[in-house]
Amino acid sequence: MKKIIILTFFLFNVPVLSQSGQIEYVSFLKSDVTSYFNKELDNIVGENDSKISYSLIVNGNKSIFFSENTLSEKTNKINLQEINSKLIGTIFLDLKNKVFVQKKIVYGEELTIKDTIRNYAWELINNETKIIDNMLCYKAIHKEIIEKKIENEKNEIQVIKKEKIITAWYCPAININLGPLGFYGLPGLIIILEDDIFVYQAKKIKLNLNFKQKKLVEPPKAEKYLNNDEFKLEYNRLKSARENMMKN
């Protein structure tokens, strides 16, 4: 029987991180997703077996996560890695002051979100472990409900709800409770993070930072900041504008 512990990471109980460092991740599509796109949508979707590098820089209770490179090859086909990189953008967390800032590209527009960091209810599955690059890692999952609005054949808007599962493999030996994409709250560094499409895996871990690296851990600057609700409104506006443009 699986031994599962529910760990809800409350903002008022954020522990002080005892280490700083820079972790380099690579992202790639899950094999079943790659096979589907290459087989079913070959005419519009390009090769998606490429990888994009990301950096997570941690300085105490502050961290920043961003892409190190983009795919340079120009093509008329869709590259999911490139799109995902733009949607992620730059993510800044300040756990002590409960601040989340994310700057990203949405439908060609640069938007910056600034709001309170969210809570994650992790399920720690302590009897599932694996060795990743000589590190003993434990499994944890986070579940959330995603709502998506679609238009049916009668031109009616329907709301579809779907459970999304995030799987993390974390290493308690590394005293950094962060990971890719702004995820945090596990008792150790997230070495691998998986959603339904992408995998993010740590490839290089360097503990302790020099002065230049510490200076990078600052929130993205913007002329205008949106909270989460304002961002959703702006996102829907840009989406509608793009859809109307495609119809004309």
Segment roles from a protein language model:
Residues 1-24:
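Bacterial Sec-dependent N-terminal signal peptides
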Residues 20-248:
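Extended soluble regions of mature proteins
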